[in-house]
């Protein structure tokens, strides 16, 4: 892209306007039109980054067994269903710390329910084949009533504060600084169990959000796939991002009936589709999956399978990058799904800036920053009404 006045004329661009492309188009009569078109395509694809240095793995990050308020699956059946029926690569069992209303808490007894959860995670862990993450869901009023803790090992202790079911700002800050745990809230938009990203201190906002379970996207208020009975302003992903929070996204089904990772046809749209997380990781191990989540190299979607490869100047989703004065953002988009993709939106600072209705592979050039640090992510919509999202990339220019 060498035209000296391109940045005077436009904000967004694409490889199809490069000089080599134009020269081929204006090359006159050609003996092999098909071969010419192939060269035209090659001139655009040469701007693409190399193949990803990571592998894609899919997982279930939120579900319950009879150890708390699950109604059908014990911890063995839980992992078996996810591994053998949903055919996912990794899973976290996230039973409630209160153990289910009227039942013993997870830490009660010797051995305790938590001991069973630890041992079951170890039992089903097969490095390279199926990864189990030790986790649980913790009530944490008033900041996040439903908050899930994911650990980087199978021997971690539960985190209890001054008062069970609650958390103080001091306790939350200490938790967010730990390297061995990732904290991700659930139902942040809910009136009863939500969060207020527009009001709380910025350093209390978690590094990721659970975007969707079965229905109810937490992207923004008024999303067309939202079906819950209550919602509350301030608890959405975009509320946090617009404040400057560096927040990525994951998903989980929050199933209580053993249908984790699978379509629940009887529930109808949108609730029949489970939230599924995708990660870009070096390997399918506890260390590999945890590192990918901690780094926000994550995307998520409603049911089935979807792969989102989103990079800016070679950097992956979840990264914060700085460009030089003469550099511009080379935005790479490549999305694949198990059904036809209806629309891909490039969202910049909360607004759709480029939409693809048909193409699923595209390089976009963005010449200008709008604020000190811009955030970019993709929103994907399929023909059957499912949605997908990826963690943002944050871009600062010198």
Describe the residue ranges of each PLM region:
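Extended, charged catalytic domains and RNA/DNA-binding interfaces, predominantly
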Residues: 1-398
């Amino acid at each position: 892209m060498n035209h000296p006045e391109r940045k005077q004329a436009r904000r967004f661009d694409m490889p199809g306007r490069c000089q080599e492309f134009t020269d081929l188009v204006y090359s006159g009569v050609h003996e092999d039109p098909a071969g010419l078109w192939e060269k035209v395509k090659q001139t655009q694809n040469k701007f693409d980054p190399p193949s990803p240095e990571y592998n894609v793995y899919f997982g279930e990050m939120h579900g319950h067994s009879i150890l708390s308020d699950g109604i059908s699956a014990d911890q063995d059946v839980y992992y078996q269903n996810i591994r053998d029926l949903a055919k996912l690569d990794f899973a976290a069992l996230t039973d409630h710390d209160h153990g289910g209303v009227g039942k013993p808490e997870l830490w009660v007894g010797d051995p305790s329910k938590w001991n069973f959860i630890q041992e079951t995670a170890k039992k089903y862990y097969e490095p390279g084949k199926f990864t189990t993450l030790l986790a649980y869901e913790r009530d944490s009023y008033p900041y996040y009533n439903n908050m899930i803790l994911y650990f980087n090992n199978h021997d971690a202790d539960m985190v209890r504060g001054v008062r069970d079911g609650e958390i103080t700002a001091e306790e939350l800050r200490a938790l967010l600084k730990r390297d061995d745990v990732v904290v991700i809230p659930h139902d942040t938009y809910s009136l009863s169990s939500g969060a207020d990203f527009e009001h709380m201190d910025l350093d209390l906002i978690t590094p990721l959000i659970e975007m969707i379970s079965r229905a109810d996207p937490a992207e923004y208020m008024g999303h067309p796939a939202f079906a819950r009975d209550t919602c509350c302003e301030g608890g959405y992903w975009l509320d946090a991002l617009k404040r400057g929070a560096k927040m990525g996204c994951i998903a989980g089904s929050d199933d209580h009936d053993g249908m984790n990772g699978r379509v629940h046809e009887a529930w109808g749209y949108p609730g029949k589709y489970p939230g599924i997380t995708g990660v870009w990781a070096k390997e399918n191990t506890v260390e590999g999956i945890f590192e990918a989540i901690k780094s926000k190299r994550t995307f998520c979607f409603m049911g089935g399978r979807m792969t989102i490869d989103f990079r800016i100047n070679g950097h992956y989703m979840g990264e914060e990058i700085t460009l030089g004065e003469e550099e511009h953002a080379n935005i790479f988009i490549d999305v694949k799904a198990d059904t036809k993709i209806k629309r891909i939106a490039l969202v910049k600072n909360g607004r759709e800036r480029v939409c693809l209705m048909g193409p699923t592979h595209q390089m976009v050039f963005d010449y200008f920053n709008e604020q000190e640090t811009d955030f970019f992510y993709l929103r994907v919509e399929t023909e059957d009404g499912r949605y997908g999202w990826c963690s943002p990339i944050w871009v600062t220019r010198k």
